[in-house]
Amino acid sequence: STKNIFQIISNEQSQIGSLHKNLEFYVEINSLNNTISKNKNSNQTIIEIPLHRFSKNDLVQPTFLIGENLLDCHLYLTYSRWLSRSHWNQRLPSKLNAILIPGGGDTTEKLLNHLSQDGRYFSLCLTDSDIKYPGGNIGETTKKCQKLTLKEISHHLTIPVRASENLLSPEQIHQVLNIDHTRNILLNNLKKITRFRNTDAWLYFPLKEGIRPIIGPHQKNSRDEYWQITAYANDSLENEFLYPGISTDLLKWTVDYLKNYDPEKIKDSNLISAWTKISTTVIAWTCASEPIRA
């Protein structure tokens, strides 16, 4: 009955309490306004939505979470759920709920633009920077997303790392490799690049492919200078690594691992900073109550 529904909402509200005060974004339903508006209040963004917009079910559907692929989306949601209850002991009486949408290349920007202009659903898009070294240029996908004029119920976040793999700590990668004996050989590669931990270099290192020497004549650029890449005339070094990578399957292995195990505790300040930004945004845009079945 209607009475039971309101009782459930009332009980839930008392549980949630002042949770919204800890969120970067939250929605207020306003019976007086006719249009959706967005306002800044100190360090929070408040999206005001008129009551009549809820006469249809569109805005009560889960947020569309757009990533460059589904593995990225799963990683962001899994870590955000875990961080909300472990690192900051934030009690979430609600769950994180989203419809995961894989983008990739130009598709990411087109999906975000379509959902935003459609204006019926909440949408959140996360893209990595694709920056190759500190001070380098952001990638084309993120650049295009940043140029979009988004409506109030859509949001884009640029993640300050080269790729989502760079959000993984050395401890997390070690556990993912150690659980399968066929990957143990890669632990030595991890040991060689752990020297970069808790530095800007870890955020931009090509974890999937590593860094090879340059063979033949080459005009050094800023990337080469940063990673101290040397050009060699001897092509016998073509298959050698200056710094080895881990694997192009690292993200897939990690997402599979996290289906059965909690993430490893994050120790490095640069990763804590990156994950704090990601998780506070994801929590604000995807936290949702359980469906009411009165």
How should these model regions be labeled?
Residues 1-294:
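Acidic, divalent-metal-binding catalytic cores of TOPRIM
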